Each structure stands twice: as C-alpha cells, then as structure tokens.
Amino acid sequence: MKRYNPSEIEPKWQQIWANDARYRAVDFGDKPKYYITGMFPYPSGAGMHAGHFLEHSIVDTVARFRRALGYNVLYPMGWDSFGLPAENYAIKTGKSPKQTVPENIANFKNQLQRVGASIDWTREINTSDPAYYKWTQWIFTKLFERGLAYQKDSLQWWCPKDKTVLANEQVIDGKCWRCDSVVVKKPMKQWFFKITAYADELLAELPEMDWPDKIKIAQRNWIGKSEGAEVNFLIDCKPSDSLKFTPELAEKIKAGAKTNTIRLGAKNLAAGDVAELMMRDGDTVESFGYAKITNAQKLPLKKVPNNMPGHESYRDDNEKLADFQKFYGNDVTLDSVVAVYDFEYIPPITVFTTRPDTIFGATYLVLAPEHPLARMLADGDTQAAVNAYIDEAVKKTEIDRTNDTKEKTGVFTGGYAINPANGEKMPIWVADYVLGGYGTGAVMGVPAHDERDFAFAEKFELPVVEVIERPEDDTSAEQCYHGEGILVNSGAFDGTRSEDAREQIVAWLEQEGVGCAKTTYKMRDWLISRQRYWGAPIPIVHCPVDGAVAVPEYDLPVLLPDVDDFVPRGDGKSVLAAQEDWAHTTCPKCGGPAMRETDTMDGYACSSWYLLRYTDPHNDQCAWGTKQVNYWAPVDMYVGGDHATAHLLYVRFWTHVFRDLGLTEFAEPVKRLVYHGLIQAEDGRKMSKSLGNVVDPLDVIDQGYGADALRTFELFLGPITENSSWSSRGIAGVYRFLNRLWTLVQEYDESDKSAQVNLKKLDSLTHATIKKVTDDIYRLSFNTAIAALMEHVNDLYKLKTEGFSPAWRSALETLVQLVQPFAPHMAAELWRQLGHDSQLDFVDWPDFDDAKIMQDTMTIVVQVNGKVRAKLQVATGASEDKIKQLALSDESVKRYVVGEPKKVIYVKGKLISIVI
C-alpha cells in the first residue's frame, strides 16, 4: 500500500499548478466573478510565522471553494514593502532596503508557494517598485488638485526611537504602534490628507456594510461625530485705543497674514498695550477682537520697507506713496512721519459644546497647553507660572493628561473672557486635561453639569451655577447633574426643556453673531509625511515664486534615490534633505530653481489603493483601467486581522475620492470584511521572536506534517474570529486524520470491490456530509466543517468492515472533493488515483439530496424548571416513555431532580421539560 508522504506529493502538485498557471484569473470571463484576497504582508523580516498563515489559509480555502462552485476567482498577492518595518529591518541587518526587500519578498513568496496558496502570481505587485509608486504619486497629485492634500504647521506625535512623526491612528495608549516607545509632541510642518472632508460619507455607509460590528463600531467611534454649537467668548481686555480695518484686511488679520499696520496719525498705543480691532464696512463698525502691541515706532514713510513682513507689499516707493495718499490725501509725502505698530492678534476663544443649553452655567474657560492664546494671555504676575505649567504639560502623554483618576491640575492665566449668554466675566485657565488636538483646544467649564468640570472647579474654588433642574425622581448621589431637564438661571430660556433650549440658544447665538450650529469630528486629518528614507517621495516641489507645485504626470515617478546612509537623522528631516543633487530641481510651473519635498509618504498611502491595482496590475498608462476595476471590484471578501481604524479607514476614504474623480463606479472598496483572531504560541502569548515562541510554518512542513496538515490544523483550531493557541498535539491529530483518509482510498483501490454494502447508509452519510461541509464553508465555520469530515471518515471506516463495493468510488470521490479546499495537494493526488485526468480545482462542487439523508438519531433538549441541563441523542422513532426514561436517568439531569418531579412534558422530537 502506498503510504501518505506529503514531502513527495506536495512539491509535485505545486510544480504542476505553477507550470500550467492554474489559478490565473480571466478578465471579463463567462463565469460570475469572485474577488477575494487578504491584507498583503509587509516583508520586513526573514519570513512569516505560523500565526500569519491563518489569513492565507482562510483566503485560499474560500478561493478553492468558490472555483468549485463555478466562479471566476481572482486571488492576487502583493507586498507592502515601503515603510518603517522594512526600513528598520534593513537598518538592523546593515543592508539597504533596496537589497533586503527583494530578499524578504523571495522568502515570503516561497512560503506561500509551499503551503499551496492558489494565488494568481501574474498579478503580483510591490509597493516599492517605481512602476507602482508612480501611481501612488499620481493619486497624491489628484488629491492636491482637489485641496485634499495640504501642508501645515502643527504639533505632531514624534517617535524618538523611529525618529519620525506618526498619524493619530498610529499612537496607541500614548505609544508608537511599531516600537512601543512613548511618543512626544513636536511642532513641525507636515503634509495631510483631508479625510475629514469625507467624514459624513464614511459614517453614513457603515450601517449597510457587511463588516464585523466591532470594526464598524471602532470606525464610528474614531470618526466621533458630535453635533452642537461653536461659541465665541470675547477676551475681557482693557484696550488703550482702537485700530480700524476694512473687511478684507480683517480677514487677513484673523488668518495671521497681517501682523502690523502703518498709520499717519499716532494712536495711544505702546509696546505691551492692547488695541481693540474694529472692522469698518461702510457706515457699520464692529469689533472683531483684540491685538497685543509687540512693537511701536515712528519713522519717515520712505524708511518703511516696501516688502515688510505681515503687511501689504509695494513694488516701489511710488506705489507706497500713492496708496497712502489715497487714504490720507495728497499732503502725504515720503518724508511724512508714520507710526508702525506690530501686533499679535488676540482672537475670541472659540469653544465647541454639545450642550449649548448649559451655557448660562459656564463659569470659567480652560485652554489646552498647546492653545495659541495660552501664553499670550498671561500677564506679568502669571507669566512665569503659566510658562512653567505649559512646559511640563506638553511632556505628558495624552493618556496621562486625560486620566480621570488623577487629581486635576491647572494654572490661572490672569485673563478673563465674557460669557456671551449673560455678560459675566469668566477666568481663563490652562489645564492639561484639555487636549490641543481635539475640538478647538478650549472648553467652557460648566461644573454644575459635568463631573470633570466639577472636580476642577472644586479644587480651584470656582463658582458652580446650576442651570438644569435636577428631576425629582433623580436620587443619585452625584454632586453634579449631567442629564437633561428644565432650564433655570438661564434668563429668557428659563422653563424650557433641554432639547428645545439647545435649538433656541443656538439660533440666538447666531443672531447675536457670537456662535453657530456646528458638527465636529474626533477624527483628525490623516498625517501622511514621514521623515524617513524608505517611502514613496512626495511629488511636490517648493518654488519661491509659485509655492508648492505638484510634479506633472509626465515627470512621474519621482524616483527614490540610492543613498549610502539611510539611518534617520533625528532632526525632523528625512535623509533625502541631504541629497542635494536630488533635492535641487526646477519648478514645473515657472522653470525657476526649486527644491523637492524631502519627506516621504507613509506606507499606508501605497496600501490604500492596491486592491484596485490588482485588477489591472501591468497598466503603464494609468493606475487601472475603468473596465477592469469595475468588473472585478469591489472586493467580494477581504480577510485580515489588523488596522481597524487605519488602513481600513484610509482605503475607504481613497475609494470615495476615486468615485468622485470618475475613476470607479463604486465608493466602498470591500463588500465583505472577515476579521480573524490570532493564533498564539503554545504558551498562550503572541508569537514573537523576542519571546522565542515563534512557530516557523516551513519547519512544520519539513517535520513531515506537510502543508495540508498545517492549513487544515489552523482552520480546525476554533472559530476563525476568535484567538486560539498553537498545539503540537493538535497538528499531529490533524495529520492522523489526513493519513486515515489517504489510507481509506488506498484500501479501496487495492480491494476487489466485490462486497455487498448498505448503499442507503453510504448515500446518507455522503449527502449529510456534503450538506454540512457546504453550509459550514459558506458560514466560514471551517472548524466544524473539518470536524464533520473527520466524523465522516470515522463512519466510513465503520462501514468498510462490510467490505468495498463499486458504489464506494462515488462516495470517496465526493469525500476528496469536500476535503480539497483544506488539503488541496492530497486531494489532487487522490483524485488522480481514483482515475481522473480532470483538474480537481474546477470540478463542480457536489450537490446534496435531502431525500437521501437518513435521520437515524434526533437531539432532545432536556430542561429542568426552564433551564437546559442536558441534550440527548435518541433513536428516531423512540417512544415518549422511552425518551422520558432516558431523560430522568441522565446523570446531568439527576443532579437537579430530587424525588418525583411535578410534571414531565414531552414536545415531540424536540424537548423534555421537567418541572420540580
């Protein structure tokens, strides 16, 4: 008898499959399409461990199943090879990532080929290939054209170990998602994608998506939509004088573009004074804030620079003189003495609140330490304390700052604001529990109706004013009431219910010009630039004349240059900044000298569109053909176990943009998402090289178990959505199952097939198994499908004691077909042994006939006082008395039934209910 030898069978079939391009997908085929893939791996190390292979086992099993069902299946593969993981591995090994990445890809590919993954390798992609990232850069330029890619100065998360900024999604519990280092905030000019512009769309689509609830909840919470009002609290300043401006100049002041003014007549202003800023529009004059005078000087008009920063520029003195004569008359000359005032704009403090109905109870304001007014509002008495507090606060992680179990800290700025609702003065504080990156970076303190505000007010002895009446039936012992109710101490709104008051107060704020209805999002725009080498260069040049200019398509890709030293500098700049020959270029717009952007794109940029590139991977004229992408995509099933709010949000955002650009007919990239659990090490911990508990899949294969046993075992461990642990005994058990199946076919093949067997019984077992396995694979309940196959093999072994007959061939052929998605190598070999030349992969999946399934037993649930205490397997047709007797004699039931029961009720074929 030929023994089961995976080391002989598996390489043989892998070679056959490779030679005839068995799994090559056909564009626009006659069969219905089915596009399935997993999250492509980043080849950052020496290879994948057994835990990584769960994803590929799931995908390959479904792909093979769908082919057998008659689908034109697309199962592609690619490599997420740009980014920190690959670069850090290269640094660790002392080689360039341009060398390590191809080496790692070759190893990863070998692993996938050795487990028999039915991948269409003709569609293989690699994100660090210029042919790929050319189109990543092209997509960037399209986003830039639509205002969805922009650069700004802001405080950003900085990883001191990886020496780069991180997106909000890449900071977990105050630590870097890659290296677990504590991150800090650092002021930097960075590139962003405006994902917030699509927040409502991304939120609106979630309910209808066939994605796991936990992922949809995570994305909903991450987007964090809040509806309320934005309220402007004017600073209570004592101005020494006023400065009037046109509406156009007022807008420039608010935007920070205008920071000085030149007046013919001197104002009553000196350095350190405050000026009230007035906007004059015709006969209307109204205040729009204040400004702190930082410098005041008098000098002849001719001495005023024509290109003074923060002021309108002039071509020459003549244009400057003409401008001043327009305002002040022809008596003005270049020798006329003018007053020049430099100032810092002090805008109103804008606060977002979801509870505008509580504004009359706001008794103080709190600014985040990062708020631009935090230091400016401090006066001589408080400056030192405010500066010291801010310097310490910004060193803390957000987790520490928002920990409600810690005592609140803060510092009074010395400044006051005016509550627009009641005109009351409100002290302005700085406190670290308010975060600069969320909302406006300022909150109104309503201590009577917010626990956090109450704790702060209690510590610093700030007033508490109740404006929502506590309901009479509220018996809670909490010192502040944060529910809804009837307004009190709220002026004209007294007696109004909260839900009505919110709408009325917002309308009143809008009428008064001090607020408006506002929807905000917790989600911030996607920080895309990285100060690292190994990434797609950002296709922007900076021109002193034209500013930031996108590189035109005909100059793409902007190639990543070869560098000798790619270790991050740590100074906030990429190593590309030192590549002067590469960085110096010409402006595509004016042809003048310009500098390339030296930051690279986060690896998530390349992984946000690869699912669409798979549909047309060799197209060198565009990112994909519209016919191909609209035939294959959206992805029918996408499998992974990571990136709930990063990649899975970004890929949705980009696809929505592609729809708006007319590049796709759909907005959502994935129809069904399967989010699997982890396979942990035998010790119950996550597999990790540092812990020394990694299981190498090739070691498992080479130990003699083979790839089929590895694949089948990983799917047999338990429900794929839950975590499980590797088991050496478990894989040995799965190998024994496959060996028994193999042996069963060999015994049949060598028998004389002359026995008389119970064909009805054989048919019943076969059709029951077809039904069970088919249903379980559809439901992705692979562990129960494999268990059913194991049980079926056991049943066949019992039946074969009667001997083999010709009818066994059909039963064994069906068994081989059913096991094929899990153990394809062995199935292909057995199919050949059973006399078939056809390719098993494309043989029609077997159908079941309910009429042939004999129900030899039935399950009876036994309840005691309504609680399930046992489940009995009884013969079909057993009498009621017999079933009652079995129920009362069951050990699990006897523990709960003492003496004679009051009633024993039998529901035919389903239930025994015992009442005691």
PLM regions and their residue ranges:
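Basic, alpha-helical terminal appendages of large translation-related enzymes
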Residues: 1-33, 254, 288, 331-342, ...
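Residue patterns forming the tRNA-binding/recognition surfaces of aminoacyl-tRNA synthetases
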Residues: 3, 12, 16-20, 92-238, ...
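Long, charged, mostly alpha-helical binding arms that flank functional sites
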Residues: 4, 228-230, 469, 480-507, ...
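N-terminal catalytic cores of NTP/NDP-binding nucleotidyl/phosphoryl-transfer enzymes
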Residues: 26-95, 101, 124-139, 354, ...
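Catalytic alpha/beta core of large soluble enzyme barrels
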Residues: 59, 72, 371-476
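Helix-rich, typically C-terminal accessory recognition domains appended to large enzymatic cores
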Residues: 80, 146, 150-157, 234, ...
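Amphipathic alpha-helical
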Residues: 201-226, 368-411, 556-586, 812-844
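Structured alpha/beta reader/binder surfaces that contact nucleic acids or chromatin modification marks
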Residues: 239-346
